[in-house]
Amino acid sequence: MNIGQRYGWEFALAVLLVMEILLFGIANPRMLDINILLFSTSDFICIGIVALPLTMVIVSGGIDISFGSTIGLCAISLGVMNQADIPMAAAIPLTLNVGAMCGIINAALILYTGVNPLVITLGTLYLFGGSALLLSGIFGATGYEGIGGFPQAFTDFANLTLLGLPVPLAMFIICVLVFWLFMHRTHSGRNIFLIGQNNKAAYYTAIPVARTLYFIYSLTGIAAAIAAIVLVSYFGSARSDLGSSFLMPAITAVVLGGANIYGGSGSIIGTALAMLLIGYLQQGLQMIGIPNQISSALSGALLIIAVVGRSISLHRHQIRGWMQRRRNQKLPS
Protein backbone atom coordinates (compact mmCIF):
# COMPACT_ATOMS: atom_id res chain seq x y z
CA MET A 1 0.00 0.00 0.00
CA ASN A 2 1.53 3.35 -1.08
CA ILE A 3 1.44 6.56 0.96
CA GLY A 4 -1.43 8.01 -1.08
CA GLN A 5 -3.64 5.00 -0.39
CA ARG A 6 -2.63 4.73 3.27
CA TYR A 7 -3.03 8.39 4.19
CA GLY A 8 -5.51 9.49 1.53
CA TRP A 9 -8.28 10.30 4.02
CA GLU A 10 -5.93 12.25 6.29
CA PHE A 11 -4.71 14.22 3.26
CA ALA A 12 -8.32 14.97 2.28
CA LEU A 13 -9.05 16.22 5.82
CA ALA A 14 -5.95 18.45 5.72
CA VAL A 15 -7.08 19.95 2.40
CA LEU A 16 -10.59 20.51 3.80
CA LEU A 17 -9.10 22.20 6.88
CA VAL A 18 -7.06 24.63 4.76
CA MET A 19 -10.04 25.35 2.49
CA GLU A 20 -12.28 25.94 5.51
CA ILE A 21 -9.88 28.47 7.03
CA LEU A 22 -9.44 30.27 3.69
CA LEU A 23 -13.21 30.46 3.09
CA PHE A 24 -13.85 31.85 6.55
CA GLY A 25 -10.92 34.22 5.99
CA ILE A 26 -12.64 35.61 2.90
CA ALA A 27 -15.81 36.22 4.94
CA ASN A 28 -13.89 37.63 7.92
CA PRO A 29 -10.18 38.47 7.44
CA ARG A 30 -9.61 38.16 11.20
CA MET A 31 -9.89 34.38 10.72
CA LEU A 32 -6.53 34.48 8.89
CA ASP A 33 -4.77 36.14 11.83
CA ILE A 34 -2.23 33.59 13.05
CA ASN A 35 -2.72 34.61 16.68
CA ILE A 36 -6.48 34.08 16.45
CA LEU A 37 -5.94 30.72 14.74
CA LEU A 38 -3.56 29.58 17.47
CA PHE A 39 -5.21 30.96 20.59
CA SER A 40 -8.80 30.17 19.57
CA THR A 41 -7.87 26.48 19.84
CA SER A 42 -8.00 26.85 23.64
CA ASP A 43 -11.80 26.83 23.33
CA PHE A 44 -11.95 23.33 21.85
CA ILE A 45 -8.56 21.61 22.03
CA CYS A 46 -9.39 19.73 25.26
CA ILE A 47 -12.01 17.81 23.28
CA GLY A 48 -9.19 16.67 21.02
CA ILE A 49 -7.06 15.55 23.97
CA VAL A 50 -9.87 13.17 25.00
CA ALA A 51 -10.68 12.14 21.41
CA LEU A 52 -7.18 10.70 20.85
CA PRO A 53 -7.39 7.78 23.34
CA LEU A 54 -11.09 7.46 22.50
CA THR A 55 -9.91 6.59 18.99
CA MET A 56 -8.06 3.58 20.41
CA VAL A 57 -11.14 2.51 22.38
CA ILE A 58 -13.33 2.65 19.27
CA VAL A 59 -10.69 0.88 17.13
CA SER A 60 -10.72 -1.94 19.72
CA GLY A 61 -14.44 -2.38 19.11
CA GLY A 62 -15.52 -0.58 22.28
CA ILE A 63 -16.95 2.80 23.19
CA ASP A 64 -16.71 5.14 26.15
CA ILE A 65 -19.39 7.80 26.55
CA SER A 66 -18.61 8.49 30.21
CA PHE A 67 -15.54 10.69 29.66
CA GLY A 68 -17.55 13.92 29.95
CA SER A 69 -18.63 12.95 33.47
CA THR A 70 -15.07 11.82 34.21
CA ILE A 71 -13.88 15.33 33.34
CA GLY A 72 -16.44 16.80 35.75
CA LEU A 73 -15.48 14.38 38.54
CA CYS A 74 -11.76 15.05 38.06
CA ALA A 75 -12.36 18.81 38.04
CA ILE A 76 -14.36 18.67 41.29
CA SER A 77 -11.77 16.34 42.85
CA LEU A 78 -9.06 18.87 42.02
CA GLY A 79 -11.16 21.66 43.53
CA VAL A 80 -11.84 19.67 46.69
CA MET A 81 -8.14 18.87 47.13
CA ASN A 82 -7.28 22.54 46.67
CA GLN A 83 -9.84 23.47 49.34
CA ALA A 84 -8.24 20.90 51.64
CA ASP A 85 -4.92 22.77 51.21
CA ILE A 86 -3.29 19.90 49.35
CA PRO A 87 -0.44 21.39 47.26
CA MET A 88 -1.10 21.45 43.51
CA ALA A 89 2.09 19.42 43.01
CA ALA A 90 0.29 16.55 44.79
CA ALA A 91 -3.29 17.37 43.75
CA ILE A 92 -2.57 17.13 40.02
CA PRO A 93 -1.10 13.57 40.13
CA LEU A 94 -3.98 12.52 42.40
CA THR A 95 -6.45 13.94 39.87
CA LEU A 96 -4.77 11.89 37.13
CA ASN A 97 -5.23 8.82 39.34
CA VAL A 98 -8.94 9.63 39.71
CA GLY A 99 -9.24 9.67 35.91
CA ALA A 100 -7.32 6.41 35.58
CA MET A 101 -9.58 4.75 38.17
CA CYS A 102 -12.67 5.81 36.20
CA GLY A 103 -11.22 4.14 33.11
CA ILE A 104 -10.29 1.00 35.06
CA ILE A 105 -13.83 0.77 36.45
CA ASN A 106 -15.21 0.95 32.90
CA ALA A 107 -12.85 -1.76 31.64
CA ALA A 108 -13.51 -4.04 34.62
CA LEU A 109 -17.28 -3.81 34.24
CA ILE A 110 -17.07 -4.44 30.48
CA LEU A 111 -14.75 -7.44 30.85
CA TYR A 112 -16.42 -9.15 33.79
CA THR A 113 -20.08 -8.59 32.87
CA GLY A 114 -19.82 -9.08 29.12
CA VAL A 115 -22.38 -6.29 28.69
CA ASN A 116 -22.11 -3.97 25.69
CA PRO A 117 -19.61 -1.13 26.41
CA LEU A 118 -22.22 1.45 25.38
CA VAL A 119 -24.55 0.27 28.16
CA ILE A 120 -21.75 0.06 30.75
CA THR A 121 -20.37 3.52 30.02
CA LEU A 122 -23.88 4.98 29.92
CA GLY A 123 -24.24 3.74 33.49
CA THR A 124 -20.86 5.09 34.59
CA LEU A 125 -21.67 8.39 32.89
CA TYR A 126 -24.42 8.86 35.48
CA LEU A 127 -22.30 7.31 38.25
CA PHE A 128 -19.35 9.66 37.74
CA GLY A 129 -21.58 12.65 37.04
CA GLY A 130 -23.62 12.02 40.17
CA SER A 131 -20.46 11.58 42.22
CA ALA A 132 -19.18 14.94 40.96
CA LEU A 133 -22.43 16.65 41.95
CA LEU A 134 -22.38 14.94 45.35
CA LEU A 135 -18.80 16.02 46.02
CA SER A 136 -19.47 19.60 44.96
CA GLY A 137 -22.56 19.70 47.19
CA ILE A 138 -20.70 18.33 50.22
CA PHE A 139 -18.06 21.02 49.87
CA GLY A 140 -20.49 23.88 49.43
CA ALA A 141 -20.65 24.28 45.65
CA THR A 142 -24.31 23.44 45.12
CA GLY A 143 -25.65 22.64 41.66
CA TYR A 144 -23.18 23.66 38.97
CA GLU A 145 -21.40 26.34 40.99
CA GLY A 146 -17.66 26.31 40.71
CA ILE A 147 -14.99 25.72 43.32
CA GLY A 148 -12.50 28.57 43.06
CA GLY A 149 -9.57 29.83 45.06
CA PHE A 150 -6.84 28.20 42.97
CA PRO A 151 -3.28 29.55 43.11
CA GLN A 152 -2.47 32.29 40.59
CA ALA A 153 0.36 30.25 39.10
CA PHE A 154 -2.08 27.42 38.33
CA THR A 155 -4.77 29.62 36.75
CA ASP A 156 -2.10 31.28 34.59
CA PHE A 157 -0.91 27.90 33.28
CA ALA A 158 -3.51 27.50 30.50
CA ASN A 159 -2.75 31.01 29.22
CA LEU A 160 1.01 30.50 28.93
CA THR A 161 2.82 29.81 25.67
CA LEU A 162 5.41 27.18 24.76
CA LEU A 163 7.57 27.90 21.71
CA GLY A 164 4.98 30.45 20.63
CA LEU A 165 2.07 28.02 20.98
CA PRO A 166 -0.64 28.14 23.66
CA VAL A 167 0.13 25.49 26.29
CA PRO A 168 -3.13 23.52 25.65
CA LEU A 169 -2.31 23.34 21.92
CA ALA A 170 1.28 22.31 22.66
CA MET A 171 -0.03 19.56 24.96
CA PHE A 172 -2.39 18.38 22.21
CA ILE A 173 0.44 18.18 19.66
CA ILE A 174 2.57 16.18 22.11
CA CYS A 175 -0.38 13.84 22.76
CA VAL A 176 -0.90 13.36 19.01
CA LEU A 177 2.76 12.38 18.57
CA VAL A 178 2.78 10.01 21.56
CA PHE A 179 -0.50 8.28 20.67
CA TRP A 180 0.44 8.01 16.98
CA LEU A 181 3.78 6.39 17.82
CA PHE A 182 2.11 3.99 20.25
CA MET A 183 -0.82 3.01 18.06
CA HIS A 184 0.91 2.77 14.70
CA ARG A 185 4.50 1.90 15.60
CA THR A 186 4.33 -0.57 18.50
CA HIS A 187 3.28 -4.19 18.89
CA SER A 188 0.78 -3.23 21.61
CA GLY A 189 -0.77 -0.65 19.30
CA ARG A 190 -1.21 -3.21 16.54
CA ASN A 191 -2.94 -5.48 19.05
CA ILE A 192 -5.68 -2.84 19.40
CA PHE A 193 -6.46 -3.15 15.68
CA LEU A 194 -6.48 -6.97 15.88
CA ILE A 195 -8.85 -6.94 18.87
CA GLY A 196 -11.22 -4.66 16.98
CA GLN A 197 -11.12 -6.78 13.83
CA ASN A 198 -11.86 -10.07 15.59
CA ASN A 199 -12.07 -10.19 19.37
CA LYS A 200 -12.41 -13.98 19.61
CA ALA A 201 -9.49 -14.61 17.27
CA ALA A 202 -7.41 -12.22 19.38
CA TYR A 203 -8.09 -14.35 22.47
CA TYR A 204 -7.10 -17.54 20.65
CA THR A 205 -3.84 -16.02 19.35
CA ALA A 206 -2.72 -15.15 22.91
CA ILE A 207 -3.13 -11.39 22.51
CA PRO A 208 -3.54 -9.91 26.04
CA VAL A 209 -7.07 -8.61 25.38
CA ALA A 210 -7.97 -7.83 29.00
CA ARG A 211 -4.69 -6.03 29.70
CA THR A 212 -5.01 -4.03 26.47
CA LEU A 213 -8.57 -2.95 27.29
CA TYR A 214 -7.61 -1.94 30.82
CA PHE A 215 -4.79 0.12 29.37
CA ILE A 216 -6.77 2.00 26.71
CA TYR A 217 -9.78 2.70 28.93
CA SER A 218 -7.50 3.98 31.70
CA LEU A 219 -5.72 6.15 29.11
CA THR A 220 -9.08 7.68 28.21
CA GLY A 221 -9.66 8.39 31.89
CA ILE A 222 -6.21 9.97 32.25
CA ALA A 223 -6.84 12.10 29.15
CA ALA A 224 -10.14 13.22 30.70
CA ALA A 225 -8.23 14.18 33.86
CA ILE A 226 -5.70 16.16 31.80
CA ALA A 227 -8.57 17.94 30.05
CA ALA A 228 -10.14 18.69 33.45
CA ILE A 229 -6.88 20.18 34.78
CA VAL A 230 -6.47 22.39 31.70
CA LEU A 231 -10.12 23.51 31.80
CA VAL A 232 -9.99 24.35 35.52
CA SER A 233 -6.83 26.38 34.88
CA TYR A 234 -8.45 28.08 31.86
CA PHE A 235 -11.71 29.03 33.62
CA GLY A 236 -10.24 29.51 37.08
CA SER A 237 -12.84 27.30 38.77
CA ALA A 238 -13.76 23.61 39.04
CA ARG A 239 -17.29 22.70 37.94
CA SER A 240 -19.03 19.37 37.61
CA ASP A 241 -20.37 20.26 34.15
CA LEU A 242 -17.05 21.12 32.50
CA GLY A 243 -17.12 18.09 30.18
CA SER A 244 -20.88 17.91 29.61
CA SER A 245 -20.68 19.19 26.02
CA PHE A 246 -17.71 17.05 24.93
CA LEU A 247 -19.44 13.80 23.99
CA MET A 248 -20.72 14.44 20.47
CA PRO A 249 -17.78 16.56 19.22
CA ALA A 250 -15.26 13.96 20.41
CA ILE A 251 -17.08 10.99 18.86
CA THR A 252 -17.65 13.03 15.69
CA ALA A 253 -13.91 13.75 15.49
CA VAL A 254 -13.05 10.06 15.86
CA VAL A 255 -15.53 8.92 13.20
CA LEU A 256 -14.79 11.82 10.86
CA GLY A 257 -11.10 11.04 11.32
CA GLY A 258 -11.62 7.64 9.73
CA ALA A 259 -12.37 5.25 12.59
CA ASN A 260 -14.82 2.42 11.98
CA ILE A 261 -17.46 2.71 14.71
CA TYR A 262 -17.56 -1.11 14.84
CA GLY A 263 -13.80 -1.36 15.41
CA GLY A 264 -10.78 -2.56 13.50
CA SER A 265 -9.63 0.66 11.84
CA GLY A 266 -8.89 4.24 12.76
CA SER A 267 -6.27 6.97 12.67
CA ILE A 268 -4.78 9.22 15.34
CA ILE A 269 -3.72 11.80 12.73
CA GLY A 270 -7.19 11.63 11.20
CA THR A 271 -8.82 12.28 14.57
CA ALA A 272 -6.50 15.25 15.22
CA LEU A 273 -7.25 16.81 11.83
CA ALA A 274 -10.98 16.18 12.22
CA MET A 275 -10.94 17.85 15.64
CA LEU A 276 -9.32 20.96 14.16
CA LEU A 277 -11.79 20.88 11.27
CA ILE A 278 -14.77 20.75 13.65
CA GLY A 279 -13.29 23.30 16.07
CA TYR A 280 -12.48 25.86 13.38
CA LEU A 281 -15.89 25.29 11.79
CA GLN A 282 -17.55 26.33 15.06
CA GLN A 283 -15.16 29.26 15.51
CA GLY A 284 -15.55 30.45 11.93
CA LEU A 285 -19.34 30.30 11.99
CA GLN A 286 -19.39 32.31 15.21
CA MET A 287 -17.03 34.91 13.72
CA ILE A 288 -19.35 35.50 10.75
CA GLY A 289 -22.38 35.76 13.03
CA ILE A 290 -24.04 32.36 12.62
CA PRO A 291 -26.05 31.29 15.73
CA ASN A 292 -24.80 28.30 17.72
CA GLN A 293 -27.90 26.25 16.87
CA ILE A 294 -27.21 26.54 13.14
CA SER A 295 -23.49 25.87 13.55
CA SER A 296 -24.30 22.67 15.46
CA ALA A 297 -26.61 21.55 12.65
CA LEU A 298 -23.90 22.27 10.09
CA SER A 299 -21.40 20.26 12.14
CA GLY A 300 -23.81 17.33 12.07
CA ALA A 301 -24.25 17.71 8.32
CA LEU A 302 -20.47 17.73 7.93
CA LEU A 303 -20.25 14.43 9.79
CA ILE A 304 -22.93 12.81 7.60
CA ILE A 305 -21.31 14.05 4.38
CA ALA A 306 -17.87 12.91 5.52
CA VAL A 307 -19.07 9.46 6.59
CA VAL A 308 -20.92 8.97 3.28
CA GLY A 309 -17.85 10.17 1.38
CA ARG A 310 -15.59 7.83 3.35
CA SER A 311 -17.95 4.91 2.72
CA ILE A 312 -17.99 5.63 -1.01
CA SER A 313 -14.19 5.89 -1.00
CA LEU A 314 -13.77 2.54 0.78
CA HIS A 315 -16.25 0.75 -1.49
CA ARG A 316 -15.47 2.52 -4.76
CA HIS A 317 -14.41 -0.70 -6.49
CA GLN A 318 -17.68 -2.44 -5.58
CA ILE A 319 -19.67 0.63 -6.68
CA ARG A 320 -17.77 0.80 -9.97
CA GLY A 321 -18.39 -2.90 -10.57
CA TRP A 322 -22.11 -2.53 -9.78
CA MET A 323 -22.42 0.42 -12.20
CA GLN A 324 -20.59 -1.54 -14.89
CA ARG A 325 -22.96 -4.49 -14.46
CA ARG A 326 -25.95 -2.13 -14.71
CA ARG A 327 -24.61 -0.69 -17.96
CA ASN A 328 -24.00 -4.18 -19.37
CA GLN A 329 -27.57 -5.19 -18.52
CA LYS A 330 -28.94 -2.20 -20.44
CA LEU A 331 -26.91 -2.94 -23.57
CA PRO A 332 -28.92 -4.73 -26.28
CA SER A 333 -27.96 -8.36 -26.73
Curated annotation (Swiss-Prot):
Q: Which GO terms describe its molecular function?
A: transmembrane transporter activity
> Which InterPro entries has this protein been placed in?
ABC_transp_permease
Q: Is Membrane a UniProt keyword of this protein?
A: yes
Bilayer-crossing regions: 7-27, 45-65, 70-90, 91-111, 119-139, 162-182, 212-232, 240-260, 261-281, 288-308
Q: Which UniProt keywords apply?
A: Cell inner membrane, Cell membrane, Membrane, Transmembrane, Transmembrane helix, Transport
What is this entry's stated membrane topology? Multi-pass membrane protein
Intracellular or extracellular location(s): Cell inner membrane
Q: Subunit comment for this entry?
A: The complex is composed of two ATP-binding proteins (LsrA), two transmembrane proteins (LsrC and LsrD) and a solute-binding protein (LsrB).
Function per UniProt: Part of the ABC transporter complex LsrABCD involved in autoinducer 2 (AI-2) import. Probably responsible for the translocation of the substrate across the membrane.
Q: In which family does this protein belong, per the annotation?
A: Belongs to the binding-protein-dependent transport system permease family. AraH/RbsC subfamily.
Extract the PANTHER family matched here. ABC TRANSPORTER PERMEASE PROTEIN YPHD-RELATED-RELATED, AUTOINDUCER 2 IMPORT SYSTEM PERMEASE PROTEIN LSRD
Q: What is this protein called?
A: Autoinducer 2 import system permease protein LsrD
- Recorded source organism is Photorhabdus temperata
